Protein backbone atom coordinates (compact mmCIF):
# COMPACT_ATOMS: atom_id res chain seq x y z
CA UNK A 1 0.00 0.00 0.00
CA UNK A 2 1.30 3.44 -0.82
CA UNK A 3 0.19 6.83 0.31
CA UNK A 4 0.40 10.02 -1.64
CA UNK A 5 0.72 13.23 0.30
CA UNK A 6 -1.17 16.17 -1.03
CA UNK A 7 -0.30 19.72 -0.27
CA UNK A 8 -3.39 20.98 1.49
CA UNK A 9 -1.80 24.15 2.76
CA UNK A 10 -4.00 27.16 2.26
CA UNK A 11 -2.77 30.69 2.43
CA UNK A 12 -3.84 32.34 5.65
CA UNK A 13 -5.21 35.86 5.37
CA UNK A 14 -2.89 38.54 6.66
CA UNK A 15 -3.64 39.36 10.31
CA UNK A 16 -3.55 43.04 9.34
CA UNK A 17 -4.89 44.34 6.03
CA UNK A 18 -2.71 46.98 4.37
CA UNK A 19 -4.82 48.31 1.48
CA UNK A 20 -3.62 49.15 -2.02
CA UNK A 21 -4.60 52.78 -1.40
CA UNK A 22 -2.46 52.97 1.75
CA UNK A 23 0.49 51.25 0.06
CA UNK A 24 0.29 53.62 -2.92
CA UNK A 25 0.30 56.70 -0.65
CA UNK A 26 3.22 55.36 1.39
CA UNK A 27 5.15 54.67 -1.85
CA UNK A 28 4.46 58.26 -2.94
CA UNK A 29 5.68 59.68 0.39
CA UNK A 30 8.82 57.51 0.33
CA UNK A 31 9.57 58.70 -3.21
CA UNK A 32 9.22 62.32 -2.02
CA UNK A 33 11.71 61.62 0.79
CA UNK A 34 14.16 60.14 -1.71
CA UNK A 35 15.10 57.23 0.58
CA UNK A 36 14.00 53.83 -0.74
CA UNK A 37 15.06 52.16 2.56
CA UNK A 38 12.19 53.78 4.46
CA UNK A 39 9.38 51.63 5.83
CA UNK A 40 6.11 52.74 7.40
CA UNK A 41 5.98 52.00 11.12
CA UNK A 42 2.48 51.80 12.60
CA UNK A 43 2.26 51.77 16.38
CA UNK A 44 -0.10 52.06 19.32
CA UNK A 45 0.78 54.16 22.35
CA UNK A 46 -0.98 55.34 25.47
CA UNK A 47 -2.79 58.64 25.11
CA UNK A 48 -5.68 60.33 23.42
CA UNK A 49 -9.10 60.77 24.92
CA UNK A 50 -9.90 57.03 24.77
CA UNK A 51 -6.70 55.60 26.29
CA UNK A 52 -4.70 54.49 23.23
CA UNK A 53 -3.76 56.28 20.06
CA UNK A 54 -2.34 55.28 16.70
CA UNK A 55 0.93 56.60 15.37
CA UNK A 56 2.68 56.53 12.00
CA UNK A 57 6.32 57.25 11.26
CA UNK A 58 8.97 56.30 8.73
CA UNK A 59 11.80 54.05 9.87
CA UNK A 60 14.85 52.52 8.19
CA UNK A 61 15.46 50.00 10.96
CA UNK A 62 13.55 46.76 11.46
CA UNK A 63 13.72 45.73 15.12
CA UNK A 64 13.95 42.12 16.27
CA UNK A 65 10.36 42.04 17.59
CA UNK A 66 8.82 43.76 14.54
CA UNK A 67 6.27 42.10 12.32
CA UNK A 68 6.92 43.08 8.70
CA UNK A 69 4.34 43.10 5.94
CA UNK A 70 4.98 44.03 2.33
CA UNK A 71 2.33 45.29 -0.07
CA UNK A 72 3.10 46.46 -3.61
CA UNK A 73 6.78 46.91 -2.72
CA UNK A 74 6.08 48.94 0.44
CA UNK A 75 7.07 47.57 3.85
CA UNK A 76 4.97 48.04 6.97
CA UNK A 77 6.51 47.54 10.43
CA UNK A 78 4.57 46.83 13.63
CA UNK A 79 6.24 46.25 17.00
CA UNK A 80 5.12 43.31 19.16
CA UNK A 81 3.21 45.41 21.71
CA UNK A 82 1.27 47.30 19.03
CA UNK A 83 0.64 44.14 17.01
CA UNK A 84 -1.62 42.65 19.69
CA UNK A 85 -3.92 45.69 19.42
CA UNK A 86 -3.90 45.71 15.61
CA UNK A 87 -4.64 42.06 14.74
CA UNK A 88 -7.58 42.05 12.34
CA UNK A 89 -7.30 45.77 11.61
CA UNK A 90 -7.37 47.43 8.21
CA UNK A 91 -4.91 50.23 7.44
CA UNK A 92 -6.26 52.39 4.64
CA UNK A 93 -5.73 55.81 3.10
CA UNK A 94 -8.79 57.97 2.42
CA UNK A 95 -9.30 61.26 0.64
CA UNK A 96 -12.66 62.95 1.18
CA UNK A 97 -14.22 66.31 1.99
CA UNK A 98 -12.68 66.23 5.47
CA UNK A 99 -9.18 65.84 4.03
CA UNK A 100 -6.73 63.06 3.35
CA UNK A 101 -5.51 60.71 6.05
CA UNK A 102 -4.51 57.20 6.98
CA UNK A 103 -7.42 55.41 8.64
CA UNK A 104 -7.32 52.33 10.85
CA UNK A 105 -10.47 50.22 11.10
CA UNK A 106 -9.81 48.18 14.22
CA UNK A 107 -12.16 45.40 15.36
CA UNK A 108 -10.34 45.33 18.73
CA UNK A 109 -11.43 48.88 19.58
CA UNK A 110 -14.26 48.81 22.11
CA UNK A 111 -14.80 52.53 21.57
CA UNK A 112 -13.18 55.36 19.64
CA UNK A 113 -13.10 59.10 20.08
CA UNK A 114 -14.85 61.48 17.73
CA UNK A 115 -11.74 62.18 15.68
CA UNK A 116 -10.96 58.47 15.28
CA UNK A 117 -7.32 58.79 16.31
CA UNK A 118 -7.69 57.17 19.72
CA UNK A 119 -9.47 54.09 21.01
CA UNK A 120 -10.04 51.90 24.03
CA UNK A 121 -10.10 48.13 24.42
CA UNK A 122 -12.21 45.97 26.69
CA UNK A 123 -10.57 44.64 29.85
CA UNK A 124 -10.01 40.90 29.78
UniProtKB/Swiss-Prot annotation:
InterPro entries associated with the record: FeS_biogenesis (IPR000361), FeS_cluster_insertion (IPR016092), FeS_cluster_insertion_CS (IPR017870), FeS_cluster_insertion_RrpA (IPR023063), HesB-like_dom_sf (IPR035903)
Protein role: Required for insertion of 4Fe-4S clusters.
Matching PROSITE patterns: HESB
BP GO terms, sorted: iron-sulfur cluster assembly
Sites where the protein binds iron-sulfur cluster: 49, 113, 115
Cofactor field: iron-sulfur cluster
Sorted UniProt keywords: Iron, Iron-sulfur, Metal-binding
Family: Belongs to the HesB/IscA family.
Protein name, UniProt field: Putative iron-sulfur cluster insertion protein ErpA
Subunit structure, as described in the record: Homodimer.
Gene name in the database record: erpA
